[in-house]
Amino acid sequence: EILGGGMASRLFQSARERLGLAYAIDAWSEPGEDAGVVGIYAGSAADRAERLAEVTALEIADLAETGPTDAELSRAKAVLKASLWMADESLTSRSGRLAAQVLIHGAPRSTEDQVAALEAVTVSEVRAVGRRILAPGRSATAVLGPRAAGKAGRKFHEALFG
């Protein structure tokens, strides 16, 4: 929700609204017990791909360095809490979430426990996770697209990891 995921997100505001580099941009994550994925989807014209890669890398690095603002974190918590409660209305969503919790945590957690854990998250914790994800040797980059996307992918990786 902070990096991508909505119209107020950093990537949407910078890459799409301010700079007009993408017609769509989003960030998502899939956590796992030992490893996970943080993904970014961006739809862009080929001639804007390199600049889009640079802007995206800068937004990620800034979030890892400075962390979210208090307002960004509060907004993200509100959105995530609402999605947790709404997911309880669907048996499919609820069972999938419970199964994922068993895989990751070893046991299911109640929605109330998840909301309490979410409320306890701080700006400094978000910053620490960002720094850990971006630590040298901990991340890989993959870019899908036409041949020109390869150059944009290299720029993205170099901007983030050196």
Q: Which stretches of residues belong to each language-model region?
A:
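A conserved active-site cap/scaffold subdomain adjacent to cofactor or substrate pockets
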Residues: E1-L11
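Proteolytic maturation boundary segments
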Residues: A135-G162
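Residues within well-ordered alpha-helical secondary structure of globular protein domains
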Residues: E1, L58, V79-A82, R132, ...
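M16 family metallopeptidases and their MPP-like homologs
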Residues: F12-V121, P136-G145
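A short, acidic, amphipathic alpha-helical segment used as a generic capping/interface helix at domain edges
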Residues: V121-I133
